[in-house]
């Protein structure tokens, strides 16, 4: 009977990415091939866009942020990374993610970080809605997506995949993709540190991206849609 319970626990860990009260997680599954890594960082950032350079205790990860397709989610990530969005864990202008741990790692599945408590239970003191785009799927290694505890409960926690995880589509908001450093993602172990996040803006549109406005507009749009749905049900 103990064997059955252990099996069920392992399966539930594999098929969900949550901001959970359980700090002890199961590590399992295979390794990714190194050919998913692109090694020339200069070439990777020649394309206009918003990039996040995540410095870790294992090396650097560079991510292209999908600010045009998921502006609210990207704005939240940048706002926290640069200390622009008010939260109850860090003071104004203090980078939120610097010094936090990757508190949950499941081999051949994903690495998860962004919890200010280092346990998977923390958040920035607010929640914001899901933001799904039909072109953004968990269809490859190196997908950057939001961890949550249910619909519309996004905060600061995020994960990066080791492989495609299609069962997470339309449950977790994808907002970026690794363009360099997938080998670093694969090396990250539980309790390794995220040392800093540097946001790099390439091109006019990226430089004009307004973090606070994009975050506020996304929430307003969600509230508007909710009111319209409620009204439709009443009619």
Identify the role of each PLM range:
Residues 7-16:
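Bacterial N-terminal signal peptides
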Residues 17-235:
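Cyclophilin-like peptidyl-prolyl cis-trans isomerases
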